[in-house]
């Protein structure tokens, strides 16, 4: 576990330096994030889904891939053309995701608080070493929201198409972000439902494959999904308590609350609900981040404390899951393994 915690402590040190400085410092962030990037990029069989990606990318030379998303597989094919090794492809995707996430943090005035205190400790390892398709798509979503969708709608649509072609489910991020942050977009909610229903009719084989992934993985008890629900409720509390600091309309609170309860209900039926909970957590964090507009341009100490606590809870949950799955499966997070070529150097 120390392999994961020590790089995070170094990153936290950089976060504290930036907070003392009064804002995000790109040089400090990028320097102090080198250990966590190296951990993800130089790994071997570590990360729950890593083995599955290795297996799928073994056949890239024959035109095969992982999933049905065209741009994700096109990028994998590009990396394969650079160096035909499934490990290089997997770790290349991890590096791309890591750099995009950290670049977004370093280029945002308030990135050090929302990205540094919540995103990195709570989700960095998950996005770069496990759910890699969604990880890359969520990094693209973070780039898309740097500029408000209503200011440059064409730009946002282009990013949305790219993100969706990297991971189909990430379309929900782009649609729901507009629905939750812009007044008068209630019809967007109906649009989301129509799009999802339409895709399910046009692409039944894709949804059938997604469903089969979770066969036999039904949630064992009421505690399944409880951590994500707690994080979502804490974020919702922050939205409401500090509502004058965030440009989020009440309809946004309502949508998040309804989705949080509904997705928790799904986790009691199937493990797939937990993956959708991750999408909602990501959405709510970006809502807080991009819609933060304090009148005096300063981060309130009490709000920063809330974010720190949310990040610690998310990190504690990640550590618990890693420990619980230690030694299980083909590529668990624990014990951490470096790439074979690095192991040979030792």
Which residues are covered by each model-predicted region?
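Transmembrane-helix signature of polytopic, membrane-embedded enzymes
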Residues: 24, 102-122
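Alpha-helical transmembrane segments and terminal signal-anchor/GPI-anchor hydrophobic tails
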Residues: 27, 42-46, 51-55, 60, ...
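Loop-to-helix entry region of an early transmembrane alpha helix in multi-pass inner-membrane enzymes
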Residues: 70, 82-96
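Transmembrane-embedded, aromatic-rich helix segments that form part
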Residues: 157-158, 169-180
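Signature aromatic-anchored transmembrane alpha helix within multi-pass, membrane-resident enzymes
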Residues: 190-195, 296-315
């Amino acid at each position: 576990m120390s392999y994961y915690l020590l790089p995070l402590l170094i990153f936290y040190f950089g976060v504290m330096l930036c907070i003392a400085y009064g804002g995000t410092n790109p040089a400090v962030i990028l320097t102090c994030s080198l250990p966590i990037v190296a951990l993800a990029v130089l790994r071997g069989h570590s990360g729950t889904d890593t083995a599955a990606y290795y297996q799928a990318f073994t056949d890239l030379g024959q035109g095969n891939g992982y999933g049905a998303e065209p741009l994700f597989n096109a990028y994998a094919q590009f990396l394969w053309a650079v160096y035909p090794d499934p490990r290089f492809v997997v770790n290349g995707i991890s590096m791309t995701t890591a750099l995009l996430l950290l670049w977004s943090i370093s280029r945002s005035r308030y990135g050090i608080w929302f990205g540094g205190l919540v995103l990195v400790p709570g989700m960095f390892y998950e996005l770069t070493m496990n759910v890699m398709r969604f990880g890359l798509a969520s990094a693209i979503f973070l780039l898309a929201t740097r500029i408000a969708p209503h200011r440059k709608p064409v730009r946002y649509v282009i990013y949305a198409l790219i993100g969706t072609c990297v991971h189909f489910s990430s379309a929900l991020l782009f649609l729901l972000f507009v629905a939750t942050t812009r007044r008068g977009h209630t019809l967007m909610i109906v649009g989301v439902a129509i799009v999802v229903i339409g895709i399910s009719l046009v692409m039944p084989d894709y949804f059938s494959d997604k469903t089969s992934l979770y066969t036999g993985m039904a949630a064992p008890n009421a505690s399944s999904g409880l951590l994500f629900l707690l994080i979502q409720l804490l974020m919702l509390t922050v939205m409401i308590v500090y509502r004058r600091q965030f440009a989020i309309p009440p309809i946004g609170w309502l949508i998040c609350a309804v989705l949080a309860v509904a997705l928790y209900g799904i986790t009691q039926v199937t493990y797939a609900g937990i993956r959708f909970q991750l999408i909602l957590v990501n959405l709510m964090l970006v809502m807080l981040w991009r819609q933060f507009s304090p009148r005096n341009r300063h981060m309130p100490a009490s709000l920063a404390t809330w974010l720190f606590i949310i990040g610690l809870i998310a990190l504690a949950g990640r550590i618990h899951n890693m420990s619980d799955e230690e030694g299980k499966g083909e590529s668990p997070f624990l014990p951490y393994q470096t790439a074979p070529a690095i192991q040979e150097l030792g």
